[in-house]
Amino acid sequence: MKKKVYTFGLASILGTASLFTPFMNNTASAETSQQKQEIQQKRSEVNSGIESKRKEIAKLQDEQKKLEGKIQELDKKALETSNKIEDKEKENKKTKKEVEALKKEIKETEKRIEERSKVIKNRVRSLQENGGSQNYLNVLLGAQSFGDFITRATAVSTIVDADKDLLDEQEKDKNKLEKAMSDLNTKLDEIQKTLADLKTLKSDLDKQLKEQANLSKQLQTKQAAAESELSDLKKEAGSLTKEEAALEQKLKEERAAAAAAAKAKEESATAEKSDSGSSSSSNSGSVSKSDGSSNSGSSSSKKSSSPSRNYSSGSVVSSNGNAIEAAISTGSSIVGRSPYKWGGGRSQADIDNRRFDCSSFVRWAYASAGVELGFGATTSTLVGKGRAVSASEMKRGDLVFFDTYKTNGHVGIYLGNGTFLNDNSSRGVSVDSMSNPYWKKAFNGVVRRVVE
């Protein structure tokens, strides 16, 4: 009898436990599903934020591109104005030399005038000492014949005419001197006015360039902040994706546990019916035994790892002095014959027609000498080539960079003696002086040696 009671009690406990297990599993699954929905909602919001941030960055990049175009135009005008100032200062210097030459000529003219004045004074004094016009009359009356009289009259007339010519020539020299001085003063006034106008224009352009550069920096700061926020949003999206995947795995495990519990319940109910049937059909007092067993499942998780990537920068380009001279010779061969083209030199057609911008010109010149600096090179990539050297140690063949419309916005090949070979928007391919006010202001000591 006790065995029957025990069997019935055990079956009751197992049955009750199996009733509660699916309920508990269903509750847990509902909570997990709710968490998954919340994460999906949050991930949707983050993705929306990512899309919005991408549009913001695209807009900032478009504004930056337009601004760079405006800065390029201002920079071109500033360079042209600087070149005009340089030319006008040369003209001013030449005019000053003309002034010195004219002063010398003036002194010589004054000396001739003084000498002529002395001759006239001496002649007048001689006339006065010898009776003046009476002396001329005595000369005429002393003639021995009519022919002699004519000869003496002609001589007297010649002397008088000579004095008159001296006076006329002296007057002409004075007029010439005054005219030369007047022309010179007019020319100097025009030069000074033009120089003043050019310097005012240059100052205004520099001011505009500074304002645009500040605006460019502000846009760059905004873009950097937006990109940082975008990076954070992407990280958050990645984290939410992992959480969602973990919850999905948890849901699978909970559903598997619920299925196992339901199966256990079914097996328990079947066992209980079997025990009850055996007890009813046995009248001999024999007791049937029942035992149960439970299987526990195990779950395993796999960890995945992603390989890390290592990026390396370009190495120093090295060659020999022959490559430097070959590059300079090639570049110099088109001085004055190659117009500047923004973004040029990056197609075979441009190269064949010698249409470059500053960076593609430098790349082309060195490529012709067997030194490859990278097809499609820009000032941003070239400034990372070779190794940095100080401005005091730069030598022929080094790359020199200038802060024009942006930091390191222009590049050329240093030739030595303060000159460099470059392709600029004002003169195309040309040799320019680093002492030119424009280039002097733009050069901040950035020099790269690409050929040792």
Swiss-Prot record:
Signal found in the keyword field: yes
Chief site of localization: secreted
Catalytic residues of the enzyme: 358 (nucleophile), 410 (proton acceptor), 422
Gene Ontology CC: extracellular region
Composition skew (Polar residues), residue ranges: 28-38
Gene Ontology biological process terms in this record: cell wall organization; proteolysis
Cellular compartments annotated: Secreted
Enzyme Commission number(s) of this protein: 3.4.-.-
Annotated signal peptide: 1-30
Residues covered by the NlpC/P60 domain: 321-450
Name of this protein: Peptidoglycan DL-endopeptidase CwlO
Gene assigned in the entry: cwlO
PANTHER family, per the entry: MUREIN DD-ENDOPEPTIDASE MEPH-RELATED
Keyword check for Signal: yes
Family: Belongs to the peptidase C40 family.
Pfam families: CC_PcsB (PF24568), NLPC_P60 (PF00877)
Ranges of Basic and acidic residues composition bias in the record: 39-53, 263-275
Biased amino acid composition, Low complexity: 276-317
The protein's role, per its UniProt record: Shows a cell wall hydrolytic DL-endopeptidase activity.
GO molecular function: cysteine-type peptidase activity
Alphabetized UniProt keyword annotations: Cell wall biogenesis/degradation, Hydrolase, Protease, Secreted, Signal, Thiol protease
Lineage of the organism: Bacteria, Bacillati, Bacillota, Bacilli, Bacillales
Region of interest called Disordered, as start-end residue ranges on this chain: 28-53, 258-317
